[in-house]
């Protein structure tokens, strides 16, 4: 029974990630006035499965001078973390209803840095190492902003539990009163998942492919799946925190459908941004965080602390 539960949890995520790759290629294709994949299956719908089959039947090569254990562990760790981070999300019921769901998500997103660092270091390649160091610096930097925004949300919510976020937003979405935080959160999630215009780790003109340049076949596919699973989970968290489904409906399917629609719209916006914006320069990326986002988020965090106290009101759970 445990194995069936695990499969019922993992397989939908894998299918969602597979079709996200197809949606991305279709969106980019139509934005560039072409069709995208349209040969394999009707309208190219079987393209992700053909790609997966091709990748997993190829021989996984590795450099002679690489560290075997770390080189193998890094993609496995990346995919495991990408799947585990889904567990506390209320859709509308969570697989694990944790009391400290927000902290759990923050901790796991921080751990993903290790898989990137290990893959870059174990490859024993200059390009891979530079890409990994860039990714680590970028991810750790933007996690500071994400943590402060989560702290502000927690102060409004009065709890670390994600289920309470939906209760807090029964009457009004949190985006209405915290729209500056929402904008900064969304841009920070772009940087956190290494997506355009912040994909400095995969700068093809500079670093060939970044930290995963030496990976091929199955391990490369695992990194690819982890990246897209992280994109989806970040948008799921955004939908929960700022666009929480109201619990007015007693039918769980309706809540799940509205949640998935919000997540799909946010994910499509990720793809739209990729098609529209050029890549940032690395110093501009860091300047945006440390000189712009950090002071504003700190000021807003103090604002959200002081307002309830000054108005003599406390969060609903206290």
Curated annotation (Swiss-Prot):
Q: Which InterPro entries match?
A: NADH_UbQ_OxRdtase_su1/FPO, NADH_UbQ_OxRdtase_su1_CS
Q: How does it sit in the membrane?
A: Multi-pass membrane protein
This enzyme's EC code(s): 7.1.1.2
Q: Which GO terms describe its biological process?
A: aerobic respiration
Reactions it catalyzes: a ubiquinone + NADH + 5 H(+)(in) = a ubiquinol + NAD(+) + 4 H(+)(out)
Q: Would the keyword Acetylation be found if you checked this record's keyword annotation? A: no
PROSITE patterns membership: COMPLEX1_ND1_1, COMPLEX1_ND1_2
Q: Which UniProt keywords apply?
A: Electron transport, Membrane, Mitochondrion, Mitochondrion inner membrane, NAD, Respiratory chain, Translocase, Transmembrane, Transmembrane helix, Transport, Ubiquinone
Task: Return the GO cellular component terms, semicolon-separated.
Answer: mitochondrial inner membrane
- Keyword NAD present in the record's keywords: the answer is yes
Among Pfam families, the record links this protein to: NADHdh
What subcellular compartments does it reside in?
Mitochondrion inner membrane
Q: Which GO terms describe its molecular function?
A: NADH dehydrogenase (ubiquinone) activity
Its transmembrane ranges are 2-22, 68-88, 100-120, 136-156, 172-192, 223-243, 253-273, 293-313
The record's similarity note reads: Belongs to the complex I subunit 1 family.
> Its function?
Core subunit of the mitochondrial membrane respiratory chain NADH dehydrogenase (Complex I) that is believed to belong to the minimal assembly required for catalysis. Complex I functions in the transfer of electrons from NADH to the respiratory chain. The immediate electron acceptor for the enzyme is believed to be ubiquinone.
Which protein is depicted? NADH-ubiquinone oxidoreductase chain 1
